[in-house]
């Protein structure tokens, strides 16, 4: 028997079968809330594999994270909400929008310029104007012991002080 390379569609189909009437009793009864911690656990396991530079384990953990994404999308699809296609459509649109230096007429020659542009576009997208609004965008589920990445702190300060990109780059 020939080994077939599975696709994202195969994973969606597997999750759909597991949640079907003749599927797995455990998978069938799960909700967003009941598997919330599973999503976090898989993300932390992927982060741990990165920290340990264990690429074989990272591959496995990324699969587990992807399975969680598909699982949540399938739950929502069953409830008449968004689909996995909507998730993919949304992230593709976001990546294109936030990379105008690649997909449009924007300009960014350094990683720092990309981050500044990214955060400005995100601010515009989310209609965040004040430091309070920026800080309110920090996820409530973020554990208190986990510091924000340095660029998030810089972002909040830059937006609060309304320093222009030109001023920042000229210093």
Segments (PLM) and residue ranges:
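Flexible "arm" and connector segments at domain edges
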Residues: 1-61, 67-171
């Amino acid at each position: 028997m020939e080994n077939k390379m599975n696709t994202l569609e195969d994973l969606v189909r597997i999750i759909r079968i597991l949640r079907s009437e003749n599927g797995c009793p455990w998978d069938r009864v799960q909700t967003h809330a009941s598997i919330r911690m599973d999503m976090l656990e898989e993300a932390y396991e992927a982060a741990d594999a990165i920290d340990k530079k264990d690429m074989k384990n990272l591959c496995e953990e990324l699969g587990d994270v992807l399975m969680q994404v598909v699982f949540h999308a399938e739950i929502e699809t069953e409830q008449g909400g968004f689909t996995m296609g909507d998730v993919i459509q949304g992230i593709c649109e976001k990546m294109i929008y936030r990379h105008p230096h690649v997909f449009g007429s924007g300009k960014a020659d350094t990683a720092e310029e990309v981050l500044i542009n990214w955060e400005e576009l995100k601010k515009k997208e989310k209609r965040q104007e004040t430091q309070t609004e920026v800080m309110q965008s920090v996820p409530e589920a973020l554990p208190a012991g986990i510091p924000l990445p340095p660029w998030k702190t810089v972002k909040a300060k830059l937006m609060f002080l309304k320093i222009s990109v030109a001023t920042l780059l000229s210093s």
